[in-house]
């Protein structure tokens, strides 16, 4: 894991300056944000983002759509400017990172990078764990530089268990493995 959380700090003044440097006045920019209705945390996050964009003068029109519409039009059809959705990882990091491959059917970001494509291919053909870890580190750093998606939050998970529960492992992703779980009397 490479901590890239501080790559882009919240700085409205810097955002305005960057827009100006790129030849935009913020008032000229309008985006639509399509959010899946059935996921309140995504709707809430989207509304916060729209508000933050408004503070630098960018108009963001929020459209809340049914989950089936989001899947069909945003995820599959890629008809959107902005969206908010959650992604869960897997124990093998390439399962999540491979969606950034140029040819991936899950690449609804429409991201394309020869560097990332090469690192994904190298990872998949590599047996050396240290080299695989280096490939993952480089993919994460490239994604932090290119910003095809901006990860903004990680929901807190709370687990309650009987004191006799043994073998339960809490992962930082939505994976629950119960093969070693036992309840002692």
Where are these regions (language model features)?
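Short, solvent-exposed loop/beta-turn-alpha elements that line the ligand-binding surface or hinge
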Residues: 1-13, 24-27, 74-79, 95-125, ...
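Append "and occasionally in soluble cytosolic enzymes with long acidic Gly/Pro-rich linkers
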Residues: 1-51, 131, 138, 184
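Alpha-helix N-cap/loop-to-helix boundary motif
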Residues: 7, 41, 62, 66, ...
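Extracytoplasmic/secreted envelope proteins and their assembly/folding machinery
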Residues: 12-19, 43-46, 50, 67, ...
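Bilobed periplasmic-binding protein-like "clamshell/Venus-flytrap" ligand-binding domains
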Residues: 22-41, 82-86, 127-163
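Extracytoplasmic/cell-surface-exposed regions of Actinobacterial cell-envelope-associated
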Residues: 47-48, 62, 95-96, 105, ...
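Periplasmic binding protein-like
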Residues: 51-101, 135-136
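Hydrophobic alpha-helix feature that most strongly marks membrane-spanning transmembrane helices
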Residues: 54, 58, 75, 88, ...
């Amino acid at each position: 894991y490479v901590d890239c959380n501080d790559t882009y700090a919240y700085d409205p003044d810097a955002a305005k300056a960057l827009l100006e440097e790129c030849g935009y006045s913020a008032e000229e920019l309008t985006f639509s944000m399509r959010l899946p209705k059935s996921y309140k945390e995504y709707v809430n996050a989207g509304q916060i983002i729209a508000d933050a964009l408004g503070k630098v003068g960018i108009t963001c029109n929020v459209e809340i759509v049914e989950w089936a519409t989001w899947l069909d039009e945003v995820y599959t059809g890629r008809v959107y400017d902005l969206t908010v959705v959650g992604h869960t990882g897997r124990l093998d990091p390439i399962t999540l990172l491979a969606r950034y491959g140029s040819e991936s059917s899950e690449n609804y970001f429409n991201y394309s990078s020869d560097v990332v494509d090469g690192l994904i291919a190298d990872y998949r053909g590599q047996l050396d764990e240290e080299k695989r870890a280096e490939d993952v580190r480089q993919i994460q750093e490239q994604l932090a530089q290119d910003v095809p998606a901006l990860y903004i939050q990680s929901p807190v998970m709370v687990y309650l268990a009987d004191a006799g529960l043994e073998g339960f492992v809490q992962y930082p992703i939505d994976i629950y493995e119960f093969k070693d779980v036992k309840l002692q009397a």
